[in-house]
């Protein structure tokens, strides 16, 4: 059995952001020092629904990689429908290199309509079929970027 910590950086008490980040670092260090297997960071935008305050799990992962020795670093999740697939694939691969191979990739389609409409109108959750097609295409491109030396893609 493996144990991971879902580090949902909620800010119910409206602390200064630097305080929230420092608390997140303390949790991360605690998990690393006490042999937890992994730590997972979220991606949410606009700090409204649920008060989640982490907008970029890869940046949080880079911070964790620089401060820890063994814990695996995951994203719960990268909302891939919000991002350019090649850029996101590159960023994940770079984090994996910076962390000496400790990355766990977590992906999703998004959950809050307001986030989707503001991050990428093509990811609108009101049209689930379109959102899913975008998700599939984005993931296909990301996999090609990770596994093929050269590739092309013809899509929507």
List each model region and its residues.
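N-terminal beta1-alpha1-beta2 module of alpha/beta enzyme domains
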Residues: 1-67, 71-72
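Flexible, glycine-rich active-site loops centered on histidine and acidic residues
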Residues: 2-19, 81-154
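Short, flexible coil/linker segments at or flanking structured domains
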Residues: 24-27, 61, 76, 91-93, ...
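Structural motif
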Residues: 42, 76, 106-108
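Generic secondary-structure boundary/loop-capping signal
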Residues: 43, 68-70, 77, 148-150, ...
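A short, hydrophobic/aromatic-rich structural module that often spans a beta strand
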Residues: 51, 56-59, 88-93, 156
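Conserved strand-turn element in the central/C-terminal portion of the radical SAM core barrel
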Residues: 74-82
């Amino acid at each position: 059995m493996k144990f991971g910590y879902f580090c949902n950086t909620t800010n119910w008490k409206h602390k200064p952001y630097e305080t929230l980040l420092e608390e997140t670092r303390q949790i991360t260090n605690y998990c690393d020092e006490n042999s937890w297997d992994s730590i997972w960071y979220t991606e949410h935008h606009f700090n409204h629904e649920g008060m989640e305050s982490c907008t970029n799990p890869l940046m949080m992962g880079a911070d964790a990689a620089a401060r820890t020795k063994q814990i695996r670093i995951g994203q719960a999740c990268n909302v891939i429908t919000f991002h350019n697939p090649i850029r996101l694939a590159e960023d994940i691969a770079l984090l994996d290199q910076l962390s000496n191979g400790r990355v766990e990739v977590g992906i999703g389609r998004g959950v809050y309509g307001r986030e989707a409409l503001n991050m990428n109108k093509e990811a609108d959750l009101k049209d689930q079929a379109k959102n899913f097609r975008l998700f599939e295409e984005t993931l296909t491109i990301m996999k090609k970027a990770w596994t093929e030396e050269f590739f092309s893609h013809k899509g929507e």
